[in-house]
Design a protein with these regions (language model features):
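Macrodomain-like recognition of ADP-ribose-binding/processing modules
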Residues: 1-96, 109-310
Length: 310
């Protein structure tokens, strides 16, 4: 099957799962077909698929990503070098009060654990990259998740959670659902993933190896010190978990900006400061390459300006 035939096959298979969608005609236009397929994947609940569906889906998604163009970390140039010989005192994140951004981490039932790595001390490198994070070949990319952790169910929504779940494939929602079920069995049926923690999953059909899912703070009428601490905890927790699994490279999206209303400039300040301080405090960690991934030109300029001062 070519890409169009695979796309139509997947649409027809997903239509069979829903009595509401069965009567919908498959459009002839390529972009309309892509939107329909993505929408059907977005609203699909977590449940097993047939082997034939998964095989075709995997081939289709991997080809789509290849056609968009995969960016390898080796093609990027670092914008800052972080020497890792000593650990400085961390600066306060908001206001005058120093913030504790230790965070915690989750991996399908495992409790928080300290970062680990080799005994060899090496410099770390920061990168700034504007592009689609679902096309980046890093050891791990970070997903700005919500507390339900099973992805965005709004058809064709433009959030990063939707994009990552779409192009990873339906297996990712199943994995995240199983994780949430396990947590609910341990901690109660109403369990929601706490803000500032992280969970590691396979990346399935993405060019990265893993996905780090973290729930950022939702800012209300005004930014608070607690919001800043929780955002820092997202970054720290992801770095701890990446180090624990001996990963070398991690790409952060702009956590909590956009839908969660964290001011872009303050979010960037916290992101860079927290990552820099963590890298300097963990000279033996395997994590040596950190990418700040931006999508909007506004964020590109903010990060570029701040990183020039690093």
């Amino acid at each position: 099957m070519n890409q169009e035939e695979k796309r139509v096959f997947l649409i027809e298979e997903l239509k069979k799962e829903s009595s509401v969608m069965r009567g919908i005609a498959v459009p002839k236009e390529e972009e309309a077909q892509k939107m329909l397929l993505r929408g059907l994947m977005n609203v699909r609940m977590a449940k097993p698929t047939s082997l034939s569906f998964q095989k075709v889906q995997d081939e289709y998604l991997q080809t789509e990503t290849e056609n968009k163009g995969i960016t390898k970390l080796s093609s990027l140039s670092p914008v800052a070098v972080i020497p890792r010989a000593a650990a400085p005192d961390a600066a306060p994140l908001c206001g005058d009060e120093a913030a504790d951004s230790s965070g915690s981490e989750h991996l399908c039932g495992d409790e928080a654990a300290s970062a680990s790595g080799s005994e060899h001390h090496t410099d770390a490198f920061l990168y700034l990259w504007q592009g689609d994070i679902t096309t980046l070949a890093a050891d791990a990319i970070v997903n700005a998740a919500n507390s339900a952790m099973t992805g965005c169910y709004i058809p064709n929504h433009r959030c990063i959670d939707n994009a990552i779940h779409t192009f990873a494939g339906v297996q990712l929602r199943q994995y995240c659902h199983a994780y949430m079920q396990e947590q609910a069995d341990k901690k109660g049926a109403s369990y929601a993933e706490p803000t500032g923690q992280s969970m590691l999953s396979p990346a399935y059909n993405l060019p990265s190896k893993f996905i780090l899912h973290t729930v950022g703070p939702i800012v209300g009428d005004a930014l608070t010190e607690e919001d800043c601490k929780l955002l820092a905890s997202c970054y720290t927790s992801c770095l701890n978990l990446a180090s624990r699994h001996q990963l070398e490279s991690i790409a952060f999206c702009c956590i909590s900006t956009g839908e969660f209303h964290f001011p872009n400039d303050r979010a960037a300040e916290i992101a860079i400061r927290t990552v820099r301080d963590w890298l300097m405090k963990h000279p033996s960690s395997t994590v040596t390459k950190v990418v700040f991934n931006v999508f909007k030109n506004e964020d590109l300029e903010i990060y570029r300006s701040l990183l020039q001062k690093t």
